[in-house]
Design a protein with these regions (language model features):
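Conserved catalytic-core segments of large NTP-driven translation/proteostasis enzymes
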Residues: 1-114
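C-terminal effector modules of nucleic-acid-centric enzymes and ribosome-associated factors
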Residues: 80-388, 396-443, 452-453
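C-terminal accessory extensions/subdomains outside the catalytic/core fold
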Residues: 446-447
């Protein structure tokens, strides 16, 4: 029969029904390819362990082939694993696309011939080639499901299994071992519901087949949106199918289709960020802006860098300035006490030349408290009037420029520490840090105990 294009184009999944060792070949697994395709020399992921394996060879219906596609009876010759490490019920998948689960929410149909199914009932779960013990959890207030009834149910598995959305399964009772129910997986590792909250409306959307509605639900439940990998794992759709489903919504893709967001949630985050930056400007008038790292931790913890950058870039009132965020047009304006302190601090370093005092000494003589003095110092550093050479050594820019000009007159020549001290008239205390500073600027290059002036 014809293979549905959707299955053949999807992500590779092969439930293992047999694994054995063949002389001259090594480890072989067989099964019916459930979705996607697999090629010789490709890489696959063994679920639920997550182990990556290489495909040495492919057979389709007993004949060697370069590739197998969905619906075909397939045998794979695998490298780097023993047959004893594989068993029926495991699944080979496309690497990085699926995650195993210990529970799932589903739409369950109890057979009319079955006994009433009680909350907490032990059952056998069967899906693909997997069989595992499980427990039925009915959502409150239900305590029992009557024969022939249909309901949304949570199934807890004794062992992790590879599950995917829309996967069909059956349940069998423990004794006698007969089929009692069947269903469709809606969500693996389902969310926790609050006391008194009914999952019916949410699970109805997940099981509706309306993928636009499903995407809106999932993305709006996530404060920052969801990655493409998360969406694939939670819906079973390909990137192309996700793009089509999102096309009829207001949802927006970021990072070239790697992240899906809700514009309304983005706008709410922009408002929070604007308020945080405004509050920071009011509380710290001498600081240029709120640190990006601090803002991200407060507003969007866990967000990828591109998400936060997009948040700033699309805010008409904010701008990223190096490592800080500030309001557009906002400038630090010094009051008279800070202006006087700025002049004292700059004069102290300018007059010192290359024999600079310690930073605490200069700040202590600034005429303002230590906190404001440090803020004024940062303003002078950002303006380029002062230059930080190390954490504890700061020089006036004019002194550094004069020294740089002197060094550059020796371009192509070598220079040792003693020669540098003699040339600059400074002690070793300042000479070593300054030479390392010029190394970083690529004005000099260290070779052993000497420097070459580049």
């Amino acid at each position: 029969s014809a293979i549905p294009a959707k299955d053949a184009a999807g992500y590779f999944r092969l439930p293992v029904d047999r694994a054995f060792s063949m002389r001259g070949f090594g480890t072989v697994v067989t099964g019916t390819l459930a979705a996607g395709s697999v090629a010789r020399d490709g890489q696959v992921e063994l679920q639920p362990s997550g182990r990556l394996l290489r495909v040495r060879g492919v057979q389709v219906h007993g004949q060697p082939a370069e590739r197998a596609i969905a619906g075909q009876r397939t045998a794979l010759n695998l490298a780097d694993i023993e047959a004893s490490e594989l068993s029926r019920g495991m699944v080979l998948t496309e690497p990085g696309r699926f995650r195993p689960a210990r529970s799932f929410d589903c739409r369950l149909q109890l057979l009319p011939s079955a006994r009433p199914l009680r909350h907490g009932a032990p059952v056998h779960f069967h899906a693909g080639t997997a069989e595992v013990e499980a427990e039925v959890r009915l959502f409150p207030p239900a305590r029992m499901l009557r024969p022939g009834a249909e309901a949304f149910v949570r199934i807890l598995l004794r062992e992790e299994q590879m599950l995917w959305p829309r996967q069909r399964f059956i349940l069998r009772q423990f004794s006698p071992v007969i089929t009692i129910a069947g269903g469709e997986i809606l969500e693996a590792n389902g969310r926790r519901y609050r006391r008194g909250e009914s999952p019916d409306a949410r699970l109805s959307v997940l099981g509706s087949g309306d993928w636009s509605a499903v995407l809106k639900l999932l993305v709006r439940e996530a404060p920052l949106g969801l990655s493409l990998a998360d969406l694939i794992a939670r819906t079973g759709l390909t990137p192309q199918e996700l793009a089509i489903a999102s096309g009829s919504t207001k949802l927006r893709w970021l990072a070239d289709g790697e992240w899906l967001t809700d514009p309304d949630q983005m706008e709410a985050l922009r408002r929070k960020l604007l308020q945080a930056v405004s509050d920071f400007h009011s509380a710290q008038p001498l600081q240029p802006g709120l640190g990006k790292a601090d803002a991200k931790a407060a507003i969007a913890p866990g967000a990828p860098a591109f998400f936060f950058d997009e948040l700033i870039a699309t805010s008409p009132e904010l701008i990223a300035d190096g490592t800080v965020i500030r309001r557009r047009g906002r400038q630090v304006v010094l009051q008279q006490p800070e202006e006087d302190a700025s002049e004292r601090i700059e004069a102290a370093f300018r007059q010192a030349g290359l024999a600079v005092p310690t930073v605490p000494e200069v700040l202590g003589a600034s005429g303002i408290d230590a906190g404001r003095a440090r803020a004024v110092l940062q303003i002078l550093l950002r303006s380029g009037r002062l230059v930080r050479v190390t954490d504890t050594l700061i020089f006036h820019a004019a002194a550094i420029d004069r020294l740089k000009a002197t060094i550059e007159t020796r371009r192509g020549q070598s220079l040792d520490v003693a020669g540098f001290k003699e040339m600059s008239g400074i002690s070793r205390k300042y000479a070593i840090p300054l030479l390392e500073y010029f190394d970083r600027l690529k004005i000099t290059k260290r070779t052993g105990d000497r420097r070459i002036v580049i």
